[in-house]
Amino acid sequence: MMHRTLLRGPWCRQEVILPLRTITSASKLRRPFPVPSSYKHNPRAFASVSYLASEQPSHSTSTEGKEISSDNEPSKPTSHVPWYLQEDTPVSDSQISSRDQIPDLPEDPPAILSPFLDYVFRDLGLDELKLIDLRGLETPPALGANVIMIIGTARSVKHLNVSADRLCRWLRSNYKLSPYADGLLGRNELKIKLRRKARRARLASRSGVMFDDKDDGITTGWICVNAGVVEESPVLEKDETFEGFGKVGRGTRIVVQIFTEEKRAEVDLESLWQGALDRAEREKQKYSEVTRNAPPEEVRDSNSIYLPSSDRESGKVHRSTVSLLFEQKRHFHSTRPTGHPNGRENVDSVARLMASEPPSGRLAHGDVFSAGISTYSLFQYLEGLPSEAARHELGTGPEDQGSTLFLQLFFNRLSTLSAEKSTVARVKLLCMAISRQHPAYSKEGLWTAFMRCTASGYHVSDDLSFDVVSTLLTESPPDDRNSGSFSPDSDRELAVRVLEHLSLRGTNVLNMKVLNMLHRATSTASPEVAQRISRIIKTLDLPFDADHSRVLMATLFQNQDYNGFWKLWRKLPLTNSPRTGADYEMLFQLHAELGDELRARDCLSTWVPMMAREETPIPLQGRLLQHVKQCLVVADPDIEQSAASGATSDLARIWNECQRNI
């Protein structure tokens, strides 16, 4: 009450009102401040200056009086609508920005794509959606083939993780797919990491230390959701003219790349894939021009290609008129073709021609064709020669093309072949020369020839490529600095480069054949390196291959990995690969060469009786008998005297059996 009295008191006095009159008279032309209608109806509202001035004698103009009278008129009642009941005005399509639109569907889209985009846009709330059709592009194996990629922007790190998690759950529940998200943190894991980060920030603020944990495992800013195959393509009938192998990728995949705004600008994934699409389009146009300008027919040399039985039965081989660039072609292989009917005859013809060397030492081109000689028969003839004779036939080096009759035959034959076949045949010749330890042929020259062949776009078969790797890993002949054979690190580096090239072009290099070559190359290195290769073989869990496993068994035994040897030995019958006489020959020969008395004794007493219990009983005869006798001498140097004196031990019994089978 006291405060109200103090406030009302001065306003009732005349000396307080008089100064206000002078102020009002000095500002007659000022418009009164409009007062809201709610305050006008309140009788206890604070009075304004204009209201006090209106109580004095009228000094204002007529217009001012009209305005005051109009303000005092009662306002018409209006209906008030709350904001939550007001209807939103529809927004035209022209006012919607590009970041608020669903991208257009590509040609021949899968049925799931339209609801997929609608869910990503409306329910997940991703912005700036971009759809890239990569179905005509060779994508990385991690993404798969026939990919439709969708790129979107999340509004925060939390929105990023929640959107990816909800998308995976939606695909599992609605379409029974099995998506996987790279970079996604689970709900509980994200909460735990955020809680720990907040705790570290509080501790840092209390101690006065700046908290800057950029790499916290949360703010990656990028999650890749691979929905997998969303639509299986129809199974087409097998093309009878198709030549090749491998699994054809069928079906369409959808991959969603979700970024934060900063990470999307940093990675710029759209530009990278658009550049790949542009390059593929240019290559397609270039190949179409090559096909259009190609000759209508292909001229083939009948002597350079072996026709299989299926081609010989038809009498006529139907060849495509398309350029060789797109056609499946038969190339030179390092291994002998299966069932080659004239292989032995061609080798015999080469041998007869070599025996009847002309006195001049030079050979005419017609003699090569009349003898029916091919590069395959020449290589088969060279493989059958001893190492010393083979080195003599290879001449003085890679530049020598006529010092021996073999080189004359070989290079005369190359002059009739195409540039691709001629280059591949030279690579094979280098492999054979280096494997026979010819001092004039270098591994650096082989590496250069191989890379020149691949850089020219020529097709080098996997068999020949693995031969190049095996040749690079062979031991070099002795020189001035090394008294014995050796394998320098530079050769191993070249072999690894060839394997990297094969891996980049899609060849499977993680197989028993390659690991056997690597294991054999590390036999001269430290035992730790060889054991590392053995651990890699165990870790990869490769499919069991009986032939390569037998080669690996011998390498493991020679590298003193006896446990690995016995594991593979016992695994043979369990993989439908029964032990043969050659396996037992290898077993007893390895123990005889090892010279360990205890191991030889244990091997004889255990596995000689097992020979008769095999699925196909193995008789003790021939080379096997000789290896068993050598192993008996290692186990007991006096075995012959002990058996003659009537000893009844297991070794004496085995010796007597060997003597009876001689």
UniProtKB/Swiss-Prot annotation:
Region: Disordered, residue numbers: 52-83, 284-313
Compartments in which it is found: Mitochondrion inner membrane
Regions crossing the membrane: none
A single Gene Ontology CC term: mitochondrial inner membrane
SUPFAM superfamilies referenced in this protein's UniProt entry, alphabetically: Nucleotidyltransferase
Keyword annotations of the record: Membrane, Mitochondrion, Mitochondrion inner membrane, Transit peptide
GO biological process annotation, one example: mitochondrial gene expression
Biased composition (Polar residues): 52-63
Disulfide pattern: none
Pfam families in the cross-refs: RsfS
Membrane topology: Peripheral membrane protein
Transit peptide: 1-46
Keyword Mitochondrion recorded: yes
PANTHER family associated with the record: ATPASE SYNTHESIS PROTEIN 25, MITOCHONDRIAL
Similarity remark: Belongs to the ATP25 family.
Role played: Probable mitochondrial mRNA stabilization factor.
Protein name per its UniProtKB record: ATPase synthesis protein 25, mitochondrial
Organism: Aspergillus flavus (strain ATCC 200026 / FGSC A1120 / IAM 13836 / NRRL 3357 / JCM 12722 / SRRC 167)
Protein encoded by which gene: atp25
